[in-house]
Amino acid sequence: MASDGQIVDLSGSTTSEREIFNISGPLHLTKVDWSNPCHRRSVAASLVQSVYILERDRQEKREGSQALAPPWWNAFHFQLYRPLIDDADSCVFGAIYQLTSTQNNPASHEAPRYVIAFRGTITKGDSFSRDIELDVHIIKNGLHLTSRFEIAIQAVRYVVATFGSANVWLAGHSLGAAMAMLAGKNMAKTGVFLDSFLFNPPFCSAPIERIKDKKVKHGIRIAGSVITAGLAFAMKNNHQTNRSGETFLSLSSWLPCLYINPSDYICSEYIGYFEHRKRMDDIGAGGIERLATQHSIGGLMLNAMGMQSDEPLHLIPSANLTVNRSQARDFKDAHGIHQWWRSGLHLESKIYNYR
């Protein structure tokens, strides 16, 4: 065994312990209570992890009894319905899982019938360059223009059209969370609200949440809200601005579950994004924030110059926000999917409904 949690086989290839369910999986979860939010979170995270390992199995040519991914879904009585393959590099970026129901495993009415899960960036193997390309598209608000997302949304639409939308889950981590969020938003615009489990979703903005001085942090947020709301109000007759506001309102009934670690700068801004709304309400400026939260300053400025701006992926009206307050060892620990199936976490959850 290698010193950094790697297992070396006889051929000399290495396997991370985190890929092996019997070492790193949620072994405490011997029976799933589908009404328990912690169980639902752990299963969703495990299925996302299985997508990571499906791709690693492909890269390492692990097949049959050598494959490490199946235990991650078999443990919870799922079967692999179909992997989702990127057309650019043939990597596995997602998967559709189907819950099996037997006499020994009667499916609860709260259990998902199908879970569509998406992995994040893998820094090993031949999928890295394509994953980084998709990460850049997130920053540029262009994920919806990629062929990978087109494959993803077609898979979601297929499952909903074929099996109905009841008890269909979306799940994803990091880049995969962005993919699941965008798919969920697209479906919500058509009136289909899917249960969504979004782990460490990227929030592309200045990392204000990392400012330690609370007065400075709140002051920056208030100033940003006033400027954004002012621009939106000044451009209220602009078609693009009005369409953005209407789209935001149409999403307000969708309540995705967001799982955030405050030590993860990629996603931690969601904490301030939602808390700031309540703070603005408390000081009597809720109307300003309700207008500001629908828009980004960059998008408004592009609209003012007569340029097309795409809807920022990270702007969502409502969410069930869960923050992991447990101490993270480092950034890798704070951003990792593995934290979300651990037992004994110090979690804070709050529902934010846009009104």
Enumerate the language-model features and the residues they cover.
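Gly/Ala-rich beta-loop-alpha elbow adjacent to hydrolase catalytic centers
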Residues: 172-176, 180
